Amino acid sequence: MKAMVSNASGGYCLNSAMPQPSPMPGMMLVRVEAVALNPYDTKVIEYGIITPEPYVGGCDFAGVVVAAGPGVTRFQPGDPVLSMHTRGGFAEYALAFEDMSCHIPKGMSYNEACSLGLGIGISGLALFQQPGLNLPLQHGQDLSDMTGNGRSNGYTNGHTNGHTNGHSKGEEEQKDPVIVLVAGGASASGTMATQLLKLAGYNPIVTCSPANNSLCESFGASACFDYNSTTCGADIRLHTDNSLAYVVDCVTNVATMTMCYEAIGTQGGTYIALDATANTVKYTRRDVRADWVMANTLLGEPCKLDGVYGRSSAPEHREFASHFFRLAERWLAEGKIRNHPLEIRTGGLESVDAGLQDLRDGVIRGKKLVVPLHVGA
């Protein structure tokens, strides 16, 4: 089969003779219809995260189930599916985990669907698990069994159902929703985090360019702040009456981290990023817990990497993902989650490397890059 594999120059090249994978227990073989491009796909090469060669990139994809491995019960051949993985999507056929996949709802194209999987996984991890913000899901969204039988399996992301930040359900109903800041609200990760926060019962506010205020508000942001303003952090602190305690940073650089630290109230709080945090900022406030999440841990396996990217196995993250993707599937079917604005690239797999270079160069603003592998995806 054809696939885009990493090369020595730090990019991806087409290999037309890659073996077609076979599904292991709990996995499915998917004929890929469309793939989305993410900064992660460049970092795995630039930081030497993946060895040995060849490495097939691609963590966001959608397609049709061709074969189901042993133990798969939710999907069958012919089902349209969206999924996330840490590799393998830049190919004609890819493996998908049953418990990290969603049925594509009627009316959603493969181009739209392929842009959702990684965002659901990484945003869910950043918001509702350790080492992320570990926010309780509210309004009864307790990650109970999503098979439709109405019975809870007892999984509540470590919190008692109906309780939020130490308050009882009765107290919660008398209070305004807890505010959470999403830095980089106009990014694909930002709009997904905003939607998930809103669905979980929180009040998301965001930073973005003023030109993207309407976009962010359409995804559920209650207030937008200009990240270019020198008073952005102070403006947010004023808006939140010096009480902001939760921040997720979808940009993750020194400037945004500094701004987020300025926005967090004097009682302190939690700052979570989607990449390694800068120590130059991290320890400027001892009352702020700063950490970051990475998609690899959603698999529940150790990340055998050098430096800050090395992580031990986190089986609780895999357990969380298996339940959260069920919940996300329901929200998708109900039309409560939608995709970020897309930029469609023609040329099939061979256009992937040029698209990733555009991500590196910062050419893409306010769009998620998608590459359809077949006409009409």
From Swiss-Prot:
Q: Where is this region: Disordered?
A: 143-173
Top enzyme category = oxidoreductase
Which InterPro entries does this entry report, sorted A to Z? ADH-like_C, ADH-like_N, GroES-like_sf, NAD(P)-bd_dom_sf, PKS_ER, Trans-enoyl_RdTase-like
Induction comment? Expression is induced when NaNO(3) is used as sole nitrogen source. Expression is positively regulated by the cluster-specific transcription factor FMN4.
> Which pathway does UniProt place it in?
Secondary metabolite biosynthesis
Question: Which range is the signal sequence, renumbered to this chain?
Answer: none
Enoyl reductase (ER) domain location, by residue?
7-370
Enzyme Commission number(s) of this protein: 1.-.-.-
Sequence similarity? Belongs to the zinc-containing alcohol dehydrogenase family.
Q: What is this protein called?
A: Trans-enoyl reductase FMN2
